[in-house]
Amino acid sequence: MGLKARRAAGAAGGGGDGGGGGGGAANPAGGDAAAAGDEERKVGLAPGDVEQVTLALGAGADKDGTLLLEGGGRDEGQRRTPQGIGLLAKTPLSRPVKRNNAKYRRIQTLIYDALERPRGWALLYHALVFLIVLGCLILAVLTTFKEYETVSGDWLLLLETFAIFIFGAEFALRIWAAGCCCRYKGWRGRLKFARKPLCMLDIFVLIASVPVVAVGNQGNVLATSLRSLRFLQILRMLRMDRRGGTWKLLGSAICAHSKELITAWYIGFLTLILSSFLVYLVEKDVPEVDAQGEEMKEEFETYADALWWGLITLATIGYGDKTPKTWEGRLIAATFSLIGVSFFALPAGILGSGLALKVQEQHRQKHFEKRRKPAAELIQAAWRYYATNPNRIDLVATWRFYESVVSFPFFRKEQLEAASSQKLGLLDRVRLSNPRGSNTKGKLFTPLNVDAIEESPSKEPKPVGLNNKERFRTAFRMKAYAFWQSSEDAGTGDPMAEDRGYGNDFPIEDMIPTLKAAIRAVRILQFRLYKKKFKETLRPYDVKDVIEQYSAGHLDMLSRIKYLQTRIDMIFTPGPPSTPKHKKSQKGSAFTFPSQQSPRNEPYVARPSTSEIEDQSMMGKFVKVERQVQDMGKKLDFLVDMHMQHMERLQVQVTEYYPTKGTSSPAEAEKKEDNRYSDLKTIICNYSETGPPEPPYSFHQVTIDKVSPYGFFAHDPVNLPRGGPSSGKVQATPPSSATTYVERPTVLPILTLLDSRVSCHSQADLQGPYSDRISPRQRRSITRDSDTPLSLMSVNHEELERSPSGFSISQDRDDYVFGPNGGSSWMREKRYLAEGETDTDTDPFTPSGSMPLSSTGDGISDSVWTPSNKPI
């Protein structure tokens, strides 16, 4: 409805342009009424204002003309509507109805501060009131003298009359000015303020002073009795300290040292009672003798007399009306005086020191209170600096604040009256310059069209009534209206409104961002200024403040260090176990070998059992990582030992051969060596001495179908007899599916530690008539299974000896033996300890291979190893 009404108003204005002066009368009245009613709802104009707009604009009134006159009717419109158009926000700004009472409130606050919180010039008034009260008191004292009674009475009557008027007016002003406080607003708030103790004192003094002034200096009984009320003016001295600062200071000192005061008063009271009672017992039966020697009544006739004497004596007053007469009483009085006087005088010292400390604290507090205002200004400036960030489009409250503060005086009612008095033409004041038909989207306001002025009925050139400043204000107001219009129409605006405007050289789109940038710059400058002022107030008050700051910083540092140490202790120290070790369940735990027999457990490395809960502290994790690193070091040492063995180039000879058809002599084997078996490079060494063969049951035999056999046993498995080169012929055995053999140990001997008694046999003893059948692939298998050199990095023996774990492998191998069923097996191995090694550094404790079954008690020899399926 609003959009259609504005378009109808625009059409009506277009008709007025086309028809000149007479065309305005030809416009339909219904369109004008609709346009006027719509604009009245939009801009908040009163019906009288709408009539004034109609008379001023005629039938060609459009939206922009109404906007011009909205400035003139701004005050009346704001009084009649609770809402106004937001300047920088897209929503209407709610403005409550306010009276023009800023000056009234300012005066009220000023009077309240002068009477209740006097500072500066207000102290002069309170000093004058104090002199008036003091003068009344002095004159009241002089009236008691007969020689000054008449003169002082007359002056006292005049001064009291003046004081009554002063105090009455002051009390009325106090009641009225109390309305500036929220809790004292309204008549109920005023009654609450009047019930304050000091206000009640003022009322009582005023009521008591009025009868005294009324009766005057008459000599009747009533006037004489009422004159005694003049001394009630002493109570007016209490009103000098209306805020009670003195009493608050004394009360705070007493409360701060209440325990010391109670202790001193308690001990002093006990001393008073005890000394008075003892003196009464001694002096009660001693009569007083006058100068003539006559006996008088006793001085300490009652215990009350003794208490009076004790209080006057211990308070160091000493009237002398009562004194002990006997030496016993004097001795008691002297003893208790030395004790009691110190405790009676102690509260005075406590209060004096407490008051001094409180006064010093108040001075320091006043110095700190000076930081309150700069701190509040800094907080406010920091928030406005943050809220005016152009990227934060959701913060609109600060922009609304500037909308209420930054105001532009648009076309006021006085300006309209001045324009109407000059009898300027309608088109000269409000008609837009751009034609209706042009639908350009330009954002620049152009000056008023002179041609349109020439087309007016008067045909006389009129001066344009808008200067640059007014153009800027009009453009600013147009931008605010555009914001409001876009929010109301939900993004659908009047396309013709973009082409309308007053003469201005500034782009309309850049007007509001420019203003925001200026406000942003001002906020940055104010933030830096308030920050500088606040830093200036942070200067220490005196040397004690500096010492306190350093002490507070030191305590804070110690607390932080203690907290950090506690956190470190919590990290590195394991927590208490939830369940004792002797109560933990051992059910379901798998069998584990002892650490002395397991090849994967070192005896000197402490490891927790599987049943125990692992330590979850940082130190426990460090220990776990250290153990893993040690295991990795052992494995690396083992690999380095293997590398050293295989990189040594040895000249070994083959001691046996593998015949499959018949028998052949060693001479025939030598004859075929050069032409048939020269390319065979097998490394098989015998490190053991000759001896009786082991019984078959002492070997750990594994079936060949479960374990992959060696390359040269895969085709023709044979039995190699134990012995040297003269041990006889080799007898071939037929292959069997149940052939078993004993796998070699995974640990290889260190060749540099071989026994000097080892004998290497000739290579021809191992060669047979079918040795040429060995393929290169089988030859590689023989090389792998016969401990031939590996392609690893070369490490010398010195580096091996410097191994961090001292792990080395020093062992020999026995000769080949034959099993009962044709399988081959390794003989007993002899171990040798290298320099720097222990008995735990030998091959049973290497990190590869499984536990030998001999440790389980199965009757198998310790020299035999179980097959290892885990690669190194």
From Swiss-Prot:
Free-text description of this protein's post-translational modifications in UniProt: KCNQ2/KCNQ3 are ubiquitinated by NEDD4L. Ubiquitination leads to protein degradation. Degradation induced by NEDD4L is inhibited by USP36.
Gene3D superfamilies cross-referenced by the UniProt entry: 1.10.287.70, 6.10.140.1910
Documented activity regulation: Phosphatidylinositol-4,5-bisphosphate (PIP2) potentiates the activation of KCNQ channels by enhancing the electro-mechanical coupling of the voltage-sensing domain (VSD) and the pore-forming domain (PD). In the closed state of the channel, PIP2 is anchored at the S2-S3 loop; upon channel activation, PIP2 interacts with the S4-S5 linker and is involved in channel gating. Calcium suppresses KCNQ2-KCNQ3 channel currents, with calcium-bound calmodulin inducing a change in channel configuration which leads to the reduction of channel affinity for PIP2 and subsequent current suppression.
Region (Mediates interaction with calmodulin) location: 356-537
Effect of residue 310 to V: In BFNS2; about 50% reduction of wild-type heteromeric current; ratio of 1:1; or 20%; ratio of 1:1:2
UniProt feature, compositional bias: Gly residues: 11-25
Chain intervals with Polar residues compositional bias: 587-600, 843-872
Regions crossing the membrane: 121-143, 154-175, 194-213, 226-244, 257-282, 327-353
One of the record's GO cellular component terms: synapse
Outcome following mutation: residue 246 to A: No effect on current or expression
Gene Ontology terms describing biological process: action potential initiation; apoptosome assembly; cellular response to calcium ion; cellular response to xenobiotic stimulus; chemical synaptic transmission; endocytosis; excitatory chemical synaptic transmission; exocytosis
Binding site for a 1,2-diacyl-sn-glycero-3-phospho-(1D-myo-inositol-4,5-bisphosphate): 243, 259, 366
Spans within the Extracellular topological domain: 144-153, 214-225, 283-302, 316-326
Regions of compositional bias (Low complexity) in chain numbering: 26-36
Main location: membrane
Described purpose of this protein according to its UniProt entry: Pore-forming subunit of the voltage-gated potassium (Kv) M-channel which is responsible for the M-current, a key controller of neuronal excitability. M-channel is composed of pore-forming subunits KCNQ2 and KCNQ3 assembled as heterotetramers. The native M-current has a slowly activating and deactivating potassium conductance which plays a critical role in determining the subthreshold electrical excitability of neurons as well as the responsiveness to synaptic inputs.
Associated clinical condition: Seizures, benign familial neonatal 2: A disorder characterized by clusters of seizures occurring in the first days of life. Most patients have spontaneous remission by 12 months of age and show normal psychomotor development. The disorder is distinguished from benign familial infantile seizures by an earlier age at onset.
Subunit structure: Heterotetramer with KCNQ2; forms heterotetrameric native M-channel responsible for the M-current. Interacts with calmodulin; the interaction is calcium-independent, constitutive and participates in the proper assembly of a functional M-channel. Heteromultimer with KCNQ5. May associate with KCNE2. Interacts with IQCJ-SCHIP1. Interacts (via the pore module) with SLC5A3/SMIT1; forms a coregulatory complex that alters ion selectivity, voltage dependence and gating kinetics of the channel.
Name of the protein: Potassium voltage-gated channel subfamily KQT member 3
